[in-house]
Amino acid sequence: MLEEVVTILMYVIAFLTLYITIFYLLLTIEKKDEIKEKAAGVYTPPITVIIPCYNEEGVITKTVSVLMKSDYPKKNLKVFLVDDGSTDNTFQEMKTLEKKYKGNVKAFSKKNGGKSSAINYGIMRARTELIATLDSDSYVHVKSLKKMTSFFKDSTVMAATSAIKVYKPKKIIEKVQHVEYLLTIVSRRLLSFLDSVTVTPGPLSVFRRSVFKKVGLFDETSLLEDQEIAYRIQAHNYKIVSSLNASVWTEVPRTFKALIRQRVRWNRGGLRNYWKYKKILSPRYGDFGVIIFPLGLIGSIAVLAVFFISLVSLLNGSAFQFFQYGFKVFYYGFNALQVISLIIFTLSVLWIWVASKHLKEKMNPISIALYLVFYSFLITIFWIVTIGEELSFRKQRW
Amino acid sequence: MVVKKVKRKISLNIHITTLIITLLIFIVGVFIGVQIASQTTSQIQKQLNQMEENNYNLQLLTLINTSSYPSTVLCETLEKGVESFEQQTFNMGSNLQFLESKYGSNDPSVTSLKIEYSTLEARDFLLLQKINEECGNPFFTVGYFYSNENCSSCGEQGDYLTAFRRQHSNVMVYSFDMDLKNQSFEIALLSSLYNVSSTPTIIANGKVLTGLQNVQQLNSYYS
């Protein structure tokens, strides 16, 4: 009985995975001309870039210097550095930057209250039409701000996301994330055509200030504030667009432990956000409600289901069949599920190939192979740690 | 300022196209998978047929009158034949065990292959008794009656027999699935011939041993 249930579950997961892979592939082919951004004309209204900081001594100077090289008209550019009660010399460094870029950069200091509270502090003091949020360890391309603000010529656009890339990937763990980030740029661009962008990422996103009046400020209790605000904007049916070319480079975890910590925070925050916005799971929200929003949750459940099935097969010994039966496991053991898995794998590789055509940056084939082979294992590990932490009620900070 | 909201819609066209393509690929995938699986069974069936032919050839050899033919030459040929046949039987047993774990013991094609295999083993077992008689007991024969359903110590017994077989090159082990007793004439015949009523039961060179026998006990009957 259990065997049959597991088999049916595996086929359901295989069918859904195949569906999503083909859906993305067709969407990429259908929108192949729209993916490339056409210049919508220059639009450079006053903008405030808010950079929340917590113990960023030695990092913030570089971030601000790179930002100030931007081709955005300086008379319309304000930079708010908000120190969230750092215990190092971050605020002194900010003051130096304030002096250096007088008239553009302003330093604020507040009591520690978390990343969202620092962003909100800045939003409440900003008077410009547009507001950007920039992580303190992210470096903006000279043309990116202009590219992103041009979206706001369309009065219906409430937020725009950037093309986040990994800053100088050297180690294998960074190179694998590099592939992941590049593919996310294309998939997020595709999602914007379905009005289904699920996150306005911390590294760089631009908002129309009025959206905060309509939906409220960043949630200071959320573990994943950049996703929470995006869900809230979507829940109010406002438009979020996504850029393919407005690059921003960000520092990513360089160790396996740091990567786990980051992804577990994303997972835990994500779960809370799902629960908070469960009303989106409805045809009233179109493609977002019926496919993109549930996809994240179904995907996570599928990852865990595959993990537990593998664990069971490991415990009952069938995973060790190779040692007992040798190569006949492969040539006698090939069944329908493996054929479908092979098709899904081939289509995924095809999608990566099609998606990479839209990117200016080249991806190393070895990194792609590593990404394809190891990423599912990594995602499983992230989810197991997430469950462990959820069950032990461990608190998490930004 | 009134801000225009997004008009939500479900992209039906792309969903319908996706669903059709997914269904098509899924069906083709399942079809290919089933084809591969059936090819596997037909390939094993071919191997079984080949083994049946080998077994038949050995049977023919035993019919030769030893008085008109030098018995040492005949016995050498028979012994070589039995040894290579035993290796094939062992591989086939492992193949079927794998198929059983893959498709389940209730799969009809697996059951049919198993019956055919058990029949062949039973014939080989009987043939070996005859060769032992003719050629001065060159082999130590073990008939092992087991059950997958009603026998908690059969797994352990299987491991002991594998270890025992490894220790002695002339030990020939033949396993008989008692769950197939009603479907295989040969298994029914052998079990009634040796009065086998429970599992595990071992026929060690003609001696009936009921219950679990460890390697030490098996060795005591070997000498």
Residue ranges and their predicted role:
Chain B
Residues 143-147, 169-185:
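Thiol-based oxidoreductase modules, predominantly thioredoxin-like and allied folds used
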Residues 152-167:
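Typically the conserved alpha-helix immediately C-terminal to a functionally engaged Cys/Sec
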Residues 132-146, 153-156:
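Coiled-coil termination/hinge junctions
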Residues 161, 197-214:
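A short, hydrophobic beta-strand/beta-hairpin element that forms part of a small beta-sheet core
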Residues 214-223:
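Thiol-/selenol-based redox modules, centered on thioredoxin-like
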Residues 183-199:
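Short, intrinsically disordered low-complexity segments
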Residues 125, 166-169, 223:
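Sec-exported extracytoplasmic/periplasmic mature domains
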Residues 1-140:
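Non-globular targeting/processing and membrane-anchoring segments
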